[in-house]
């Protein structure tokens, strides 16, 4: 299990009895997923990234892959440059990537990572929505196996069932 933090609670579309604030958070998350993060969300991601691992300087930020490489790029392209500047570290969108896109039915994922980039690094993995922790565990284990010193997770949202 890897230490992680998140910014907002996410109530899935199946939950119809949500407050106006929860509905607005849901919309903010959906905007992010479609590549249009608000300035406020970018500010929150940077702020939370700084405090998530305040006891340890981060060497490298990467992103938890979406279901396709195109979705990963869409979600994280606008925030990667800001993170690099604000955290004063390297940011690689594809330090971890899908070997091939996820199967839409089984959701089976096969990750690869750029060993030469992650070796010896203290890593922050930023993802969209934390539900079970399975993706963070798979990505974290892969990073450690390929030489990362430590792995922390930061998510835009955590699913509330």
Per-region residue spans from a language model:
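Structural alpha-beta junctions
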Residues: 2, 84-92, 146-150
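PRPP-dependent phosphoribosyltransferase catalytic core
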Residues: 10, 14, 137-161
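Short, flexible/disordered intra-domain loops and linkers
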Residues: 19, 69-74
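Short beta-strand-loop/turn "lid" adjacent to the catalytic site in phosphate-handling enzymes
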Residues: 59-71
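A structural signal for isolated positions on well-ordered beta-strands in alpha/beta enzyme cores
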Residues: 60, 124, 151-154
